[in-house]
């Protein structure tokens, strides 16, 4: 029974992570912080290889 509980917990965590990534998929490649006159921007650059 504990193995089944662990498996269900793992499935719930994975589904939650997938839903979160799906909701914020457009903003995963950039990060922006503004504080007063200072702006910090970090951008992830990647290329798809085929």
From Swiss-Prot:
This is Protein PndA. It holds the Pfam family HOK_GEF. When overexpressed kill the cells from the inside by interfering with a vital function in the cell membrane. It is found in: Cell inner membrane. The gene is pndA. The keyword Transmembrane helix applies. It is a single-pass membrane protein. GO terms for cellular component: plasma membrane. Belongs to the Hok/Gef family. It comes from Escherichia coli. It comes from the Bacteria. Keywords: Cell inner membrane, Cell membrane, Membrane, Plasmid, Toxin-antitoxin system, Transmembrane, Transmembrane helix. The chain crosses the membrane at residues 5-25. Induction: In the presence of rifampicin at 42 degrees Celsius. Disulfide bonds: none annotated. The keyword Cytoplasm does not apply.
């Amino acid at each position: 029974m504990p193995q089944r509980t662990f498996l269900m917990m793992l499935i719930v965590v994975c589904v939650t992570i997938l839903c979160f990534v799906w909701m914020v998929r457009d903003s995963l490649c950039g990060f922006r912080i503004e504080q007063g006159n200072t702006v910090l921007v970090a951008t992830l650059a990647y290329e798809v290889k085929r």
